[in-house]
């Protein structure tokens, strides 16, 4: 039953809802979110944890005039349901459906697109300054989780915002994942909730009064502030945020709608920077998610009654799992190997490694920049660090890859998971740029395996290489090929011919190799005889092999699960130009110059012509042209 929710078309409709009805509405929101996530998958636990917070924000503030910016955005499902997207919520994270993250193009209530962490405070400050420049009076609210506070960008935003002292509200959603609990009765007393406008005004007036008493008043004010800060700093995070120039309020029960609304109503009258610390529970209202919040943080389809995740077909190992086992095998033979991750030990397959080698495993938090430079320092001291990271998140540390790793030619291995299209999380999470943004860095070796067995060999190849190396591999299961018991070093810059052919050559990299070979077999039945190459390396290229095929066949088809601009195909064109080879017809297959939408991996590959039937059709047209 969603009787109240069915009447909510916009946040304005919340104004007349009673406190009792708000409690019922919270239950209806949770029911809707759980039901849709059970079918579609999604970020269930974060969204369940902020239902009351979302209701209070939209009850008190006037979106879209007031701007609410959700950090990361995976906790915004209740927000979507309350802002006119209830009827489309069943399409969440599906091809053509609504996004799992805030999207400005989707609703005027989505003030800022998000998907990566720690961006909200900086963005909110931009909104606040723009408001002041226009002489307007609307409020700006950033909602950020404690996990996102491990990212340096959040503190850069806090530092600048506190310095400017703009009218800005930051809501710190502490869901017990990162920030420790406060200690003792004195702590509770010193950080009791300050929701009274009177108390806030009195403090300002007292500061003004003491400041006006010349030297004596200033002395008293300094002593009072030192005493307050010294005691508060012993027990609470309040001193930290006040040092940044924010008024600190909290902690507050994030599931007490009445208390939240009272606090927001009072803070709404303030005109300086305020941070409100709320305590919530991830997965609230769904026992399986409460018991295993990490599992249900981002989860696939699951059984509604039990919470059991529905497994896919077949028994092929995932690329992530193969990587995790391979690095354990390699580390057993090489004590120099150290594994690092940025808050993704499960997602990158490093949890077993952490159990086996706790002193050689480091989770740096949501801090990719730090992680890369940390790895560079380890490499400079003779270790062989492996930084396991999603392709999309490595983008956050590009300068560190350039300045701290490649410039010094340090042996850091980048194990780049989720390369290519990743599915329902959409454009913020697709890994479609790494081939392009890595291959032009001097000293960097860039490689991609055709299957899960080759992954473990390329991983060892990267670790043994005396310089920076990146191995990129897709999300999902492999092909079920047998896995060699030992890993071998492969010659760098050498591909392999999988099929001979005289009419042209398909040069494929990584996840496109198998569909390219399937396309070649289909075209052979039509009398089109194509060679198929597993390139393995985007940098350095197998120059001799590519040039030989260009000269003997006259037609090259390059296939990559990456943007076409600057990728593998571009590298081949540059090689042909450097060697002065003219008259070779080239077809580049990859993703176009746009941000690719959400959808299942197989749907997106079919839509962009990068599955076997799509490659077959496009190559057929090319060969007959």
From Swiss-Prot:
Its EC number is 2.2.1.7. GO terms for cellular component: cytosol. Pfam families: DXP_synthase_N (PF13292), Transket_pyr (PF02779), Transketolase_C (PF02780). The keyword DNA repair does not apply. Mg(2+) binds at residues 146, 175. Thiamine diphosphate binds at residues 74, 115-117, 147-148, 175, 286, 368. Its cofactor is Mg(2+); thiamine diphosphate. It catalyses: D-glyceraldehyde 3-phosphate + pyruvate + H(+) = 1-deoxy-D-xylulose 5-phosphate + CO2. The keyword Metal-binding applies. One of its GO terms (molecular function) is magnesium ion binding. Binds 1 Mg(2+) ion per subunit. Binds 1 thiamine pyrophosphate per subunit. SUPFAM superfamilies: Thiamin diphosphate-binding fold (THDP-binding), TK C-terminal domain-like. One of its GO terms (biological process) is terpenoid biosynthetic process. Pathway: Metabolic intermediate biosynthesis; 1-deoxy-D-xylulose 5-phosphate biosynthesis; 1-deoxy-D-xylulose 5-phosphate from D-glyceraldehyde 3-phosphate and pyruvate: step 1/1. InterPro entries: Dxylulose-5-P_synthase, THDP-binding, Transketo_C/PFOR_II, Transketolase-like_Pyr-bd, Transketolase_BS, Transketolase_C, Transketolase_CS. Homodimer. Belongs to the transketolase family. DXPS subfamily. HAMAP family: DXP_synth. This is 1-deoxy-D-xylulose-5-phosphate synthase 1. It comes from Geobacter metallireducens (strain ATCC 53774 / DSM 7210 / GS-15).
């Amino acid at each position: 039953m969603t009787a109240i929710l069915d009447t909510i078309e916009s946040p304005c409709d919340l104004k007349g809802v009673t406190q009792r009805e708000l409690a019922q509405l919270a239950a209806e929101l949770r029911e809707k979110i759980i039901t849709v996530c059970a079918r579609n998958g999604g970020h269930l636990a974060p969204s369940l944890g902020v239902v009351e917070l979302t209701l209070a924000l939209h009850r008190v503030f006037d979106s879209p005039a007031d701007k609410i910016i959700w950090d990361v955005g995976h906790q915004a499902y209740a927000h979507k349901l309350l802002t006119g997207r209830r009827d489309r919520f069943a399409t969440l994270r599906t091809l053509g459906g609504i996004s799992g993250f805030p999207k400005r193009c989707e609703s005027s209530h989505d003030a800022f697109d998000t998907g990566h962490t720690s961006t909200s405070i900086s963005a909110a400050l931009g909104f606040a300054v723009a408001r002041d420049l226009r002489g307007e009076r609307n409020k700006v609210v950033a909602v950020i989780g404690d996990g996102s506070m491990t990212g340096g960008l959040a503190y850069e935003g806090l530092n600048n915002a506190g310095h400017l002292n703009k009218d800005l509200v930051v809501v710190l959603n502490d869901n017990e994942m990162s920030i420790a609990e406060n200690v003792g009765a004195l702590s509770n007393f010193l950080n009791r909730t300050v929701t009274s406008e009177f108390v806030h005004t009195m403090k300002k007036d007292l500061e003004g009064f003491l400041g006006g008493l010349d030297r004596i008043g200033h002395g008293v004010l300094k002593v009072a502030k030192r005493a307050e800060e010294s005691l508060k700093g012993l027990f609470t995070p309040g001193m930290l945020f006040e040092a940044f120039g924010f008024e600190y309020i909290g902690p507050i029960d994030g599931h007490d709608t009445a208390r939240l609304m009272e606090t927001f109503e009072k803070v709404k009258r303030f005109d300086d920077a305020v941070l409100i610390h709320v305590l919530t529970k991830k997965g609230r209202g769904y026992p399986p998610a409460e018991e295993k919040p990490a599992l249900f943080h981002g989860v696939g389809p699951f059984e509604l009654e039990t919470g059991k995740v529905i497994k896919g077909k077949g028994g092929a190992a995932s690329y992530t799992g193969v990587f995790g086992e391979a690095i354990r095998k390699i580390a057993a033979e090489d004590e120099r190997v150290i594994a690092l991750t940025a808050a993704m030990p499960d997602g990158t397959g490093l949890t077993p490694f952490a159990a086996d080698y706790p002193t050689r495993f480091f989770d740096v938090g949501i801090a990719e920049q730090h992680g890369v430079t940390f790895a560079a320092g380890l490499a400079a001291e003779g270790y062989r660090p492996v930084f396991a990271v999603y392709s999309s998140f490595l983008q956050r540390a590009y300068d560190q890859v350039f300045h701290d790793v490649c410039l010094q030619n340090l042996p850091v291995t980048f194990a780049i998971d989720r390369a290519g299209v990743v599915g329902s999380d959409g454009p913020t999470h697709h890994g479609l740029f790494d081939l392009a943004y890595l291959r032009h860095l001097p000293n960097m070796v860039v490689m991609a395996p055709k299957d899960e067995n080759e992954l473990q060999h390329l991983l060892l190849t990267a670790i043994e290489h005396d310089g920076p190396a990146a191995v990129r591999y897709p999300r999902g299961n492999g092909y079920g090929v047998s896995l060699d018991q030992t890993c071998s070093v492969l010659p760098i810059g050498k591909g392999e011919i999988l099929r001979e052919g005289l009419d042209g050559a398909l040069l494929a990299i990584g996840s496109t190799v198998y569909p390219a070979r399937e396309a070649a077999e289909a075209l052979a039945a039509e009398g089109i005889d194509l060679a198929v190459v597993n390139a393995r390396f985007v940098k350095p290229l197998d120059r001799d092999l590519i040039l030989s095929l260009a000269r003997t066949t006259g037609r090259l088809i390059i296939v990559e699960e990456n943007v076409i601009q600057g990728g593998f195909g571009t590298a081949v064109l540059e090689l042909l130009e450097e060697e002065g080879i003219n008259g070779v017809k080239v077809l580049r297959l990859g993703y176009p110059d746009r941000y690719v939408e959400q959808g299942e991996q197989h749907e997106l590959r079919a839509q962009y012509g990068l599955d076997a039937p799509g490659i077959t059709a496009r190559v057929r047209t090319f060969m007959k042209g």
